[in-house]
Regions:
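Short strand-connecting beta-turns/loops that link adjacent beta-strands
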Residues: 58-60, 94, 143
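Short beta-strand element of the conserved SAM-dependent methyltransferase core
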Residues: 38, 136-141
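Short, structured beta-strand-loop surface elements
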Residues: 68-122, 128-132, 140
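A generic structural micro-feature
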Residues: 30, 45-47, 81, 130
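Short hydrophobic/aromatic beta-strand or adjacent loop that forms the aromatic wall/cage
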Residues: 35, 132-135
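N-terminal short leaders/motifs
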Residues: 1-12, 42, 86-95
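Extreme N-terminal tail/first-helix region
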Residues: 1-29
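Short beta-strand segments
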Residues: 33-69
Length: 143
């Protein structure tokens, strides 16, 4: 419960800093890990939802994971992209339409290993929860 509250607070602060700086700040995690902003269509609300996530470049796209910082609850954006796989990705202030594809096997392993190499807590997340962490490839559309 405490960890969930801390995560929500951190995400709220991250969003505010990104907004207040007009996107100049909040593009990396501590240590330099890349942050992308995904925008997904809410499966229930029909409203667009914007979420900051750690990401790794791979195969012409970006690998992301629904870790929810190691909480048992699957993040809402995962459910959203499973219903509506089209959304947007913002990389360094450049937003593009994108397709979200859940991956498995070798690609899933490579993305997750890349995330661990940038933010070692990902290893702890998988150890500490009982659910599978869904992994996605976000492929930006060509302009």
């Amino acid at each position: 419960m405490v960890w969930g509250t801390a995560l929500r607070t951190t995400t709220t602060v991250h969003r505010f800093i990104h907004w207040a700086s007009r996107g100049r700040l909040g593009r990396t995690f501590p240590g330099g890990a890349k942050v992308v902003w995904i925008t997904t269509l809410g499966r229930k609300s029909g409203e667009w939802r914007r979420t900051p996530l750690l990401a790794v470049p791979i195969e012409g796209g970006w690998g992301i994971a629904g870790s929810n910082a190691g909480q048992e609850k699957i993040p809402g954006w995962v459910y959203n992209v499973e219903v509506h796989n089209l959304g947007r990705i913002d990389i360094d202030g450049h937003e593009r339409e994108a397709t979200f594809t859940r991956v498995s096997g070798d690609l899933e392993d490579r993305i997750y290993a890349g995330l661990i190499s940038q933010w070692s807590a990902y290893e702890m997340y998988q150890r500490n929860i009982q659910r599978e962490i869904p992994v996605f490839l976000v492929t930006p559309k060509e302009n």
